[in-house]
Amino acid sequence: MVDQLRERTTMADPLRERTELLLADYLGYCAREPGTPEPAPSTPEAAVLRSAAARLRQIHRSFFSAYLGYPGNRFELVALMADSVLSDSPGPTWGRVVTLVTFAGTLLERGPLVTARWKKWGFQPRLKEQEGDVARDCQRLVALLSSRLMGQHRAWLQAQGGWDGFCHFFRTPFPLAFWRKQLVQAFLSCLLTTAFIYLWTRLL
């Protein structure tokens, strides 16, 4: 998927192209088959994102692991999460962006087909997922997240220095407490959103 994006690069919108490439790199990395060698990051920001996402998942291991094998509609869940996490006051932050992309990547990982948690909530087990289904969802999530970041949040992204600013932010040697606070605040927003989504789906 990353190679396909590189092939159609036109330089008409460098920021959008970097955004799509970054998302394709991380989500494709998450969606690969178990046992597949880990591909090298395609860009400097891809390496930074993988590192930041790994730290976030380590801090909140139980939350993210619960979404492995999510049997519902990945696209709809991430769309709801994006609307809440990016638009909720005070708006986007780098921590929120990392949290959202990490969440999307977790949904694409090849975990158990359906965990006990999802069975308890009324989801039915599904048959073994086809490779094409994961690839399709990966492409749809790249398009969705790119659209969100390059739409109403483009001005914010540019004001932060784009993806160069992203790399600078996470490579700056802030105290660990400051760095962790950024991710914890974004995570709490994500957690509240998932609680709302659960209640919403149960009432439908």
UniProtKB/Swiss-Prot annotation:
Organism superkingdom: Eukaryota
Protein name: Bcl-2-like protein 10
Family: Belongs to the Bcl-2 family.
Subcellular location: Mitochondrion; Nucleus membrane; Endoplasmic reticulum; Cytoplasm, Cytoskeleton, Spindle
Organ and tissue specificity: Widely expressed in adult tissues. Preferentially expressed in lung, liver and kidney.
Effect of E131R: Abolishes Ca(2+) binding
SUPFAM superfamilies, per the entry: Bcl-2 inhibitors of programmed cell death
Annotated organism of origin: Homo sapiens
PANTHER family linked: BCL-2 RELATED, BCL-2-LIKE PROTEIN 10
Motif BH1: chain residues: 86-105
Keywords on record: Apoptosis, Cytoplasm, Cytoskeleton, Endoplasmic reticulum, Isopeptide bond, Membrane, Mitochondrion, Nucleus, Transmembrane, Transmembrane helix, Ubl conjugation
Function: Promotes cell survival by suppressing apoptosis induced by BAX but not BAK. Increases binding of AHCYL1/IRBIT to ITPR1. Reduces ITPR1-mediated calcium release from the endoplasmic reticulum cooperatively with AHCYL1/IRBIT under normal cellular conditions. Under apoptotic stress conditions, dissociates from ITPR1 and is displaced from mitochondria-associated endoplasmic reticulum membranes, leading to increased Ca(2+) transfer to mitochondria which promotes apoptosis.
Residue interval(s) of motif BH2: 156-167
TM ranges: 183-200
Per UniProt, location of the Glycyl lysine isopeptide (Lys-Gly) (interchain with G-Cter in ubiquitin) cross-link in this chain: K119, K120, K128
Consequence when changing K128R: Abolishes ubiquitination. No effect on localization to the mitochondria. No effect on interaction with BCL2L11, BIK, BBC3 or PMAIP1
GO biological process: apoptotic process; extrinsic apoptotic signaling pathway in absence of ligand; female gamete generation; intrinsic apoptotic signaling pathway in response to DNA damage; microtubule organizing center organization; negative regulation of apoptotic process; positive regulation of apoptotic process; release of cytochrome c from mitochondria
Post-translational modification: Monoubiquitinated by UBQLN1; results in stabilization of BCL2L10 protein abundance and in relocalization from mitochondria to cytoplasm.
GO MF, any single term: calcium ion binding
Cofactor(s) listed in the protein's UniProt record: Ca(2+)
Subunit structure of this chain's protein: Interacts with BAX. Interacts with BCL2 and BCL2L1/BCLX. Interacts with APAF1. Interacts with ITPR1, ITPR2 and ITPR3; the interaction with ITPR1 is increased in the presence of AHCLY1. Interacts with AHCYL1. Interacts with HIP1R (via ENTH and I/LWEQ domains). Interacts with CASP9. Interacts with BCL2L11/BIM. Interacts with BIK. Interacts with UBQLN4. Interacts with NME2/NM23-H2. Interacts with PMAIP1/NOXA. Interacts with TPX2. Interacts with UBQLN1; in the cytoplasm. Interacts (via BH1 domain) with BECN1.
One cellular component term from this protein's GO annotations in UniProt: endoplasmic reticulum
Effect ascribed to mutating K119R: Abolishes ubiquitination. No effect on localization to the mitochondria. No effect on interaction with BCL2L11, BIK, BBC3 or PMAIP1
CDD domains in alphabetical order: Bcl-2_like (cd06845)
Region (Required for Ca(2+) binding): 118-133
